[in-house]
């Protein structure tokens, strides 16, 4: 039964109206993944984020291609932010270490949902590395490619683009997503 529910859930998050359905039925989705409730109405309180955490997550999910691993990555990539939130003297929130916290929470979720090992491993790597900023650095690109491999590194760039495009109107440059011309 769990396998059937998850199969249908993966179809849902890859469907054409995934964002609308996930938003409209978020409480129902939370029956399957209760950990997502921390994202509902969570104010990120940062100039780089104009959406609450749930809306940011849905916007990013809707931006990326409908591949189950990529969509699950986007659904869970920031789930650890509420756990690591700090506020500086100016009132801005920061989320240092949220990548590893999100990976830890996602690991529990994905194993509980009994997803295949390869699916879990790729999703967790994408979550862990989703905030790496290459800025054209050959050295960093080689390091990441040694861990992820070429195909997963390409998917990582898609994840980063979707994540950044779902943040805010604050001026941002996508140049850090550019691969070095030669490795």
Model regions: which residues?
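Histidine-centered divalent metal-coordination motifs
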Residues: 77, 98, 130, 176
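Conserved small/polar residues in nucleotide/adenosyl-binding loops
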Residues: 175-181
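General alpha-helical segment detector with a strong preference for membrane-spanning helices
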Residues: 81-85, 167, 182
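Short leucine-rich amphipathic alpha-helices used at interfaces
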Residues: 90-91, 96-98, 138, 144
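Glycine- and charge-enriched loop/helix tracts that form the active or gating conduit
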Residues: 1-75, 79-93, 101-115
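Histidine/acidic-rich helix-loop-helix segments that form or flank divalent-metal centers
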Residues: 44-61, 115-171
